[in-house]
Amino acid sequence: MASVYENSYMIVLIFLLLGILLPVVALTLGRMLRPSKPSAAKATTYESGIEPFHDANIRFHARYYIFALLFVIFDVETLFLYPWAVAYDKLGLFALIEMFIFVVMLLVGLAYAWKKKVLQWL
């Protein structure tokens, strides 16, 4: 008989397998059952009903990707800070110290990016 500890991991394993298996099965069934009628018109880029006048593949400078990555990092930071701010009264001093360390780590990363002139556009 499995212990409670092993049973907890078994539930996580089942959810992990279902989380991987269900999308794979759904995508595979969709690919097998859909009608396939490829044409040149379907392969063109859609631009609001207008005939495309240039190639859709545009190269962006790497700094835009870095800037977008920094945005995502600080956007995720707000996702972590919001629940903490809502439950601040119940969490106590330990959570305050944890959040302080978290924000300081992000500020150190921001200072590093600023020092490396990642945020400078010119």
Swiss-Prot record:
GO MF, any single term: quinone binding
Keyword NAD on entry: yes
Reactions this protein catalyses: a quinone + NADH + 5 H(+)(in) = a quinol + NAD(+) + 4 H(+)(out)
Membrane-topology descriptor: Multi-pass membrane protein
Residue intervals passing through the bilayer: 10-30, 66-86, 91-111
Gene3D superfamilies for this protein: NADH:ubiquinone/plastoquinone oxidoreductase, chain 3 (1.20.58.1610)
EC number annotated for this UniProt entry: 7.1.1.-
EC top class, as a word: translocase
Subcellular compartments: Cell membrane
Keywords associated with the record: Cell membrane, Membrane, NAD, Quinone, Translocase, Transmembrane, Transmembrane helix, Transport
Cellular component GO terms, alphabetical: NADH dehydrogenase complex; plasma membrane
Quaternary organization: NDH-1 is composed of 14 different subunits. Subunits NuoA, H, J, K, L, M, N constitute the membrane sector of the complex.
Family the entry assigns: Belongs to the complex I subunit 3 family.
Function: NDH-1 shuttles electrons from NADH, via FMN and iron-sulfur (Fe-S) centers, to quinones in the respiratory chain. The immediate electron acceptor for the enzyme in this species is believed to be a menaquinone. Couples the redox reaction to proton translocation (for every two electrons transferred, four hydrogen ions are translocated across the cytoplasmic membrane), and thus conserves the redox energy in a proton gradient.
NCBIfam families: PRK07756.1
Record-given protein name: NADH-quinone oxidoreductase subunit A
Organism encoding this protein: Bacillus cereus (strain ATCC 10987 / NRS 248)
